[in-house]
Amino acid sequence: QLAGDDKEKGIIVTSTTTGEGKTFIASNLAMSLALLEKKTIMVGLDIRKPRMAELFSIGDRQHGITNILANEECNWEEVKAQIVASGVNHNLDLLTAGPTPANPGELMVRKSLKQTIALLKEHYDYVIIDTAPVGLVADTLQLSKLADRTLFVCRADFSTKSSFTYINKLDEQKKLPNISIVINDIDLSKKKFAYSYGFGKYSKNGNRSFGFYGLFSNNTNDDSIKI
């Protein structure tokens, strides 16, 4: 569905809190689009606790978007200089978080961030943005006007039902664009009927750390999501 909509180029991937698997989901979405021959870039905007470079086994932690956001404005050559190849598919590039700044909140409201995302949309079919958990910091809400769609990641047997109240509130108030929910880490042995896909950790040597994500059922007295 995403690959067929040329107007929805910028996609935020977020969650309520840490540990729900948003970076895994973002990386799998980016890789899936790349395999469909879509020129894709994944952007690491969880700049307080970045995991993207580790996930793709990128040893260079000096390049990244924080170098761009250190300035108020930017151009394509400056953005391009911070982009690295993913090493797993020729259609997938990465703009990792880069060095951790002392003022992450300030960087998220700079004009250079808006310019960076706009430039990436000009040069790529899809821009997948891995953000900070929206329930912990307000950074992600600053991106609402820069993206076209939001994938909100929850984790089975981990995320609470109150997360859905929060997501509904964000949707009603138009805090994030076009929210869709992804349920991550489903145990298929516990559910007779499941709609799921595999995902894994990407590296130059192949995939590992496999799990599942898909639809959910919340018919339970427990506060966590039961699948």
Question: Across the structure, where does each feature detected by a protein language model lie?
Answer:
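P-loop NTP-binding module
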Residues: 1-227
